[in-house]
Structure formats: structure tokens, C-alpha cells
Amino acid sequence: MASAAAASPSLSLNPTSHFQHQTSLVTWLKPPPSSALFRRKTLPFFERHSLPISASSSSSSSSSTSLSVHEKPISNSVHFHGNLIESFENQDSSYAGTIKGASLIEELENPVERNGLSGRRRLFMQDPPWISALFLKGLSKMVDQTLKIERKDIDKRKFDSLRRRQVKEETEAWERMVDEYRDLEKEMCEKNLAPNLPYVKHMFLGWFQPLKDVIEREQKLQKNKSKKVRAAYAPHIELLPADKMAVIVMHKMMGLVMSGHEDGCIQVVQAAVSIGIAIEQEVRIHNFLKRTRKNNAGDSQEELKEKQLLRKRVNSLIRRKRIIDALKVVKSEGTKPWGRATQAKLGSRLLELLIEAAYVQPPLTQSGDSIPEFRPAFRHRFKTVTKYPGSKLVRRYGVIECDSLLLAGLDKSAKHMLIPYVPMLVPPKRWKGYDKGGYLFLPSYIMRTHGSKKQQDALKDISHKTAHRVFEALDTLGNTKWRVNRNILDVVERLWADGGNIAGLVNREDVPIPEKPSSEDPEELQSWKWSARKANKINRERHSLRCDVELKLSVARKMKDEEGFYYPHNLDFRGRAYPMHPHLNHLSSDLCRGTLEFAEGRPLGKSGLHWLKIHLANLYAGGVEKLSHDARLAFVENHLDDIMDSAENPIHGKRWWLKAEDPFQCLAACVILTQALKSPSPYSVISHLPIHQDGSCNGLQHYAALGRDSFEAAAVNLVAGEKPADVYSEISRRVHEIMKKDSSKDPESNPTAALAKILITQVDRKLVKQTVMTSVYGVTYVGAREQIKRRLEEKGVITDERMLFAAACYSAKVTLAALGEIFEAARAIMSWLGDCAKIIASDNHPVRWITPLGLPVVQPYCRSERHLIRTSLQVLALQREGNTVDVRKQRTAFPPNFVHSLDGTHMMMTAVACREAGLNFAGVHDSYWTHACDVDTMNRILREKFVELYNTPILEDLLQSFQESYPNLVFPPVPKRGDFDLKEVLKSQYFFN
């Protein structure tokens, strides 16, 4: 025992360890008496070296324990709460070392003599429970005011540093890129480094100088012309240095190429306006920076004084965190907005110069005897498309076409693209108005209005008091701190490096294009054309998907070493919230969701471990998510070996996680569950994983609450049940019944009988799910037909194209009929909403309404007016909002848009209430996320807010607002409600689950 005590077991601070605990038989000390004295002691484990700890116990107990603890350097703000312990993980050691005042509570009692040795007091990192309680509940009360002030100062310095970085990210991105190309040019000349550059960098470097030269030439040309003969874009092309303008044009153009244009063509009007907008934004920042830079020799004394005062004012505002006021100073330096016509004219000329300057070179032959070939990287041409096959109505528009060599190399090096709207290092500005909030300097608007002036005017007119709850909700979503899950990112990178084509990742290789047959046989040639067309289509789709993956990964790589980051949110015109950053965000694919986690960690607790297991079962899916909670827990217990193998050996193990519907999210859940189960104190394990609670066909849930129909409410889990009700299975069962009945009819008199016989074995939940899901959002017969046709193609039973089309038509009609039978009340409300919209639109008014949170919504569907702009490249037709509303679109879009505004309202109400309850919250429309330990609290809140929302007379208020706004129009009465008691929702465990 003496030797054991002398050995002094230590804490192994290995950053990559995952709570690997080595335990021996131990007798825990009793909790200290409440009267015990305590003193503070500096935490040596913040210094990243081993801390020797040996056991002190009663004379009857002489066991010792050795623990290997996952290192957790100090985080941004170290506060210990009853249900919260900040994550110490993945922080810079330099910052960890600055925390000198962090405290450890040590009992001041006489040390126990054991075999002549003075035993040291023990530090318990996980057990026993009273120690956990001490750390999680009592520690914050024992930190004195001096220590709090010291930490506050540290946090302030750190925050100021992050804020300065954020300002640089937003204002100097293009400047840094220009400097990089200059440095690359210099290195290429001095060290011949060009062959080692990534494809995109090599390509941009080859374009940079020629494009810069032609822009400089154009600037001089326009400057020397008289005002009468100068081009319309002349005053604006001179506003930036040529090198910066060249970088913006290159990156914006390539960004458009990588944004999903499958055929490698971008519409001229889209490219021109996009470039024009980027130039205008940079001009505003450039003018301000230029005005406040160091003194010029020709400056008068007054000008020098003005510059100095302006610089001091802005620096002072930024230091005092008054970013909004600083931004106002910057904005005051600008001019009036340019407008689409100006943006298009300047953008078109810069596009023309890019086409002139940018070339690509095919690989040289082995012999090297042939003359190097250079081809234009971009070509301007006109494209003609028909509305549908066989139609005489054609549309002709200009496009910029990318060379195939450019497309081939682009998707392998997309990570070198500049992405301006990256996640923020500091919390976003609070929303206070239409354009007041979000990013610090980049243009931010509370709503994506897509040019609808009526919607913009409605938003600009609202007061902060009217829509303060909407602003609060967006601030809540924007203040949720995220970080990159490095474990999952590492797995993604390895799979991607190996060629993808697994876990939902696209194949990094193209499919081979079949060679043209030597035969002149027409049928053989036709077959080859069809095969080649199909292969080219697949390759274009793969190119687009590869670019998308690379853009997501490039952001993840950029942010992986950050302690945390934030996503400013804004709204679509219906009131649904979205992150403003477009690539790596939690509304995106399984890849993104698996790669992201909360920056703040919280202990699992008993409830959290329970919900973690259910969450894992939901992610695995395959029908498991439709079982009862007990059955899902049993599923996880039965696959614990697979789960642990997935966590410990995801690449070379059994790969059970790859069978999940959401593989990367499933793997992330496997990792944290394995950590918990291997810990001697699983409830104390810190989890950063967001746990989801999803609505059950949420659109129908909202309709059921509006109509108070008991049958429909039960079908979508507004009523408690032993297991989740599955509306998709119910619809598929009804479709099967109808088809079975049709199949018994005479095929001579009933053509659908033959189709019914074929389809009766094809009907399942998956066949009808998408149509049922989108029915409440206004899916048409044509939309339903296309959805079902895709599912039938996947099954592969019907291969004949004509038969497939006929089967899809029949299935769509039967599915929509079954929906109408089961959801009569919902259909009645949809029809009433559509009728009201038609009445309003027929009087040439767009449909307007106010959401329960005070957000004004205006449907933007008007007949567009074409505005022709003559540019140096071609005549551009800019679409702008007309004065005549589109009656058909106003009518068909109102029911789904209205329900979307209600589900957005429910999510925002829940977000604010969760924040007030101390929860971290993220929302994905009808999927609400929080820490595992807080799921029970969030579940209670989201149910209470749903009942609160629908206890208001929503349809009656809507009708009253229509009658007040349009007193000369006559509207039908609100459909009758059923007798469903909304309070039943509070007791339904599968309402969201």
C-alpha cells in the first residue's frame, strides 16, 4: 500500500483521449460536512502537465484510483451552473495558461496518516455523486468577486480580439486576396512554384495579371473620353483599383459556376448583376478605408484634421463595441445605391473583359513536340429552351459557357475559393430593423424579399415594438454558439480523399462516356446518343455535387480550429428563419449536421442519456423511428457492440453507422454514447451533440390544430398514443385498398385495372410519403405525379417509359383522393384560404397578413415587367416587379405560405422561451434542437407554445383583417371547427419526438 501511495497516480492530459477511465477498487470519501472550511487552490491541470493526485481516505479504506481524463482547457466564459459546465475542450494552450485564478475547492481537514505517509487529498473528476454536485452546483458560489472581475477582463480582451478579426474578415477579404496573388506572382518568378499550386490557384494566377491589365486599359480609356461619349459604366469602373476589381470578377464568376449550374452555363444577367453588386459593396468599404488612411502630401491642414478625427471616432466606436454607430459612419461615406441597371452595365463590361483575358491550356502531350494550345475559359453564346418537349414557345437568353477543362479541374480544388459570408466569430448584431442587424459590416437584411418592393416597404414601416418578438427570436438563433466536430470532420475528409461514393458523398470520378459506334445503324446510333446524353447528365450533376461538398468542407476546414462561431439568421418572406451563411450550416445536409455541434457542452444526466439513445435510433431510421420510445431504446441496446465499433473504428471496422439514413449524424451520436457508456459516471459526461425533436408531418399538425378535427389530430400525433401514429402508412394503406378494388374491375371498360394490378405490390409508405408531406404545402397533381414517378423509377419494376408515366399518373390521382378522404377538415381550410386569396387578387391586390408575432407578410407574386438594358455584351432583360398581381399564383400559394408562417411563428415562440429557460436552441423549421439534458424542458416548452398559438382565433383574426383591409369585398365564412381539445397536445409524447 505504501508503494501504491508513493506512486501517486496522475491525470493523463491527452487531448485525444475520450474519457478513458482506468479504475481500481475504491472506497469513496463521505461528503464533507457543511461546516467544513475551504480554501482556493490554483488548478494546475490548466497548465497542460500531469497533476499527481493520491487518495486520502479513512483509516479503514486504503484503495487508490487512477483516472485518464480528457483534457478540457478553459473556455470563453467559465461559469458553473446547476445544469451547465462549460466545455474546456479544444482551446488554445496560450489562453489556458492565462487563467491563473481558476479555483479548486479543497477541504481543510487534517491529512490522514496512512502507513506513516501523509495522504494527499483526492481530486475526483467524475465520481462520486457528491463531488459532481459540488462542481456542477456549488463552485460558482465560492468564487470571489476579484476572480470574477479578472475573468471578465480576460473575456473582454478575448472578445475584442475576435471582434477585430471579424471586422477584418468582412472588410478586408478582397484586399488580402489581391496581396496573395501579388505574392504568388513574385514567388512564381523567383522560385518557379507554379507547378505546385492547386488547380484553381494556378488558374486564377494565370488570369490575374491579364485581367488586371485590360481593366486598367479600360479605366484609362474611359477616363480620357469626353463625358458625351463615355460609356454608361465609366463613372463606376474607376472606383476601385484594377487589381481588386480583377479578383472580385474572377471569384464571383467561379462562385456562380460552382453553385449548381449543371451544364456549366450561367445566365449573363445573373452573372452581370452579381458582379455589379459585389463591386458596389466593395466600393463603399474601399472609399471609407481610403478616406481614413495615412495622410497624403497634398492634404490641407483641415483635411488632415478631418481624417484624423474620423479615424479616431471609428476606432473609438469599435473599441466600445458600438459597431452599429461605426457602420453608420461608413455608410455615410457612400453614395446612393447604384440600382440594377448600373450594376448590370458595369458587370457586363467586366464579364466581357474576363472573356477576353481568361484562357485555359490543355495538358501537353508526352512528346512535347506540339505547339501549346490555349482556349478561352469562357464563351458568350445564346441558349434557346422550350417550356416543355414539343412546345413551339421558346425562350432565348444569353449565357456564359465555361470550358470543359475548367469544369474538370474546378471541383477538385474548390476549397481555394473565397467565401465572404462565413460564420461569425462574435455574436451577430441584434436585429432592430429591416437592415439593422446580422453581420457587422456586410449588408444584412432581416428578410429575403427577392426585390419585392411591397414587402420591403411593409418591413421598413414596422416599429421595433411591433415585431420585437421576431427580432428576439432571430437574435436567439444567431447567438447559439457552434463549433466543428473534429472527429466527424476527420472521417469525412478520409472518405472524401478515398474518392467519396459512400455515406451520401458523391463519387469523385465521372462515369465514362460511351464511344461512338463505328456502325451507321440508326438504332445503334440512337442508343449511343441516349447513353452519352445520360452519362453527360450524370457527370454534370456529379460536378455540381462535388463543388458543393468542397465548399462545405472548405468552410469546415477554415473554422475547425475556432473555439466557436455564430450563424446570423434572417427570414424568408413567409417568416421562416434561415442562417445567412449558405454552405456549412445546420439546415443543410447530413454532412453539415454531422460536422457541427454546440460549442457549449453540458452533462448528459440521466434524462440526457435516455434521449441520446432515442436520438441515435431516430438517425438510424429505416422504420426504427416509427417505433415506441421503449422499442427504440431496445434497438440501441441490441446494437451496442455495433455502436462502439462505429465510434472506435469508423473507417476499418464493421461500418454499422453507414447503414443509417443520416450516417454522419449517427456516427456523431455513436461517439458520444460510447464515451458515456465507457465512463464510470456516464451521467457526468459532457455532451456537445444537438438532440433533435421532429414534428410528425408538421404541416398537417398545424391544419389539425386550426380545424380541431379529432380524427386528423390523432393521425398526426396531437393525441397521446402507445406508439407514434404514422400518417404516411395510413395513406399508403388507403391507396392500397383503392388499387385493390380497381384491380378487380374489367380491363376492357376500366383502363386503370391493368395499372392497378401492377402497382398493387409497389405501394408502400415511401411511395406516398413525399406527396403526403407536400400536399399541405399546395402540391399539384403534376407535382405529385413527378414525385411518385421518381419513386417508381427507384423501384425499377416498371422500365417502359410510357408505362411508367401512366402508372405515375394513376398513382398520383389515387394518392390525392386518399388524402382528401382522410383529411377533409384540412382540405376545407386549404380551399377557404385559396378562395380568400382569389377574391383579393382578382381585385389586383397581393395577399397580405400579419403573423401572430407581428411580422407583416406580402405575397410577392406579380406579373413581372421586363426592363431592357443595352450593355457592351448584349441587351439584358431585367425582371422587375410589375403592377398587376398574378391571380393564379396568389391563390395556389396562399395556403402553404400561410401555414409556413405559422410553423415559423411556433419555432420562434419556442426559441425565445427556451432562451429564457437557459437552454441552447437551434431550429430547422419543424425540427427543434437542444442539449440532451434539456430535451424534457424543450419538449414541455414547444407543446405549451403550440397550444398557446392555437388558442388564439387565428382564422377569425385573418378574416377580420381581410374585411377591414378590403371592405368592398365579400369573403366566405371560416370553416366550422371540430371539438378537439388542444390541451391533449400537452400529454402527447409523440407530438414532436
Curated annotation (Swiss-Prot):
The gene is RPOT3. This is DNA-directed RNA polymerase 3, chloroplastic. It comes from Arabidopsis thaliana (Mouse-ear cress). Its EC number is 2.7.7.6. One of its GO terms (molecular function) is DNA binding. The keyword Isomerase does not apply. Disulfide bonds: none annotated. Nuclear-encoded DNA-dependent RNA polymerase that catalyzes the transcription of DNA into RNA in chloroplasts using the four ribonucleoside triphosphates as substrates. Required for chloroplast development and leaf mesophyll cell proliferation. Keywords: Chloroplast, DNA-directed RNA polymerase, Nucleotidyltransferase, Plastid, Transcription, Transferase, Transit peptide. GO terms for biological process: DNA-templated transcription.
